[in-house]
């Protein structure tokens, strides 16, 4: 079943916050990314998490990016990581990939994330998508993949044109291949899950999104929404 998803749909799903609410009610999230020279992507993602309403935001990134993150968003708890790192306890949703290059540092970080077990859901975006093909991704965690058409083509081993010619089938194929929910970005973004027959098409957006960093923001908005409560205690 195909359904339309738009701003009105999203607005209806977000609760008005209780006057008794506190930061612990709105999730603990972490962004992992930002190789040397690409820290802006990870910083944008962590900032978008704040603006989307996450209760607590962590950022694990290359040490060279920590100062810039703290200057721009002191609310974000930024950590510099070298070859390995430890996740804080009880992360609800983890976003891995913004600003990750296809290099050894990034690959080590990716492997640390996939082998960790102290978070709920993992969103794999941008650079992290390079590694799931060569690593035959195996994790029991709930996964969301957020490829643009070029990344989708690499995940499926087909051409960009083939993805664009049948975006619905491409999204479903990725979802089934990796047992993951998928957000296939682009004109009429496709949202689907491997364990649900429903499929959503989002008609919002336009050419104003054709700019570096918008995908990093989208991934953060998406994963932050997963941490927000669907109800409050009476």
Short names for language-model regions:
Residues 1-121, 130-144, 153-226, 231:
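Small-residue (G/A/S/T)-rich helix-start motifs and N-terminal tracts that mark the onset
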């Amino acid at each position: 079943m195909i359904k339309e998803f738009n701003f009105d749909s999203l607005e209806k799903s977000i609760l008005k916050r209780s006057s008794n609410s506190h930061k612990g009610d709105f999730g603990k999230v972490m962004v992992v990314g930002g190789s040397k020279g690409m820290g802006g992507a990870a910083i944008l993602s962590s900032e978008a998490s704040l603006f989307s309403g996450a209760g607590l935001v962590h950022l694990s990134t290359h040490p060279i990016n920590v100062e810039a993150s703290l200057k721009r968003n002191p609310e974000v708890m930024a950590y510099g990581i070298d070859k390995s790192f430890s996740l804080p306890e009880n992360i609800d949703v983890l976003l891995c990939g913004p600003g990750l290059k296809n290099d050894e540092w990034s690959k080590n970080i990716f492997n640390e994330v996939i082998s960790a077990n102290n978070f709920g859901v993992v969103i794999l975006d941008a650079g992290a998508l390079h590694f799931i093909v060569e690593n035959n991704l195996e994790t029991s965690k709930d996964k969301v993949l957020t490829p643009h058409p070029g990344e989708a083509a690499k995940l499926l081993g087909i051409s960009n044109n083939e993805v664009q010619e049948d975006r619905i089938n491409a999204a479903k194929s990725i979802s089934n291949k990796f047992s993951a929910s998928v957000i296939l970005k682009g004109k009429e973004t496709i949202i689907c899950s491997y364990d649900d027959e429903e499929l959503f098409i989002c008609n919002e957006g336009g050419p104003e999104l054709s700019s570096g960093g918008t995908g990093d923001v989208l991934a953060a908005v998406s994963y932050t929404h997963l941490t927000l409560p669907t109800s409050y205690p009476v």
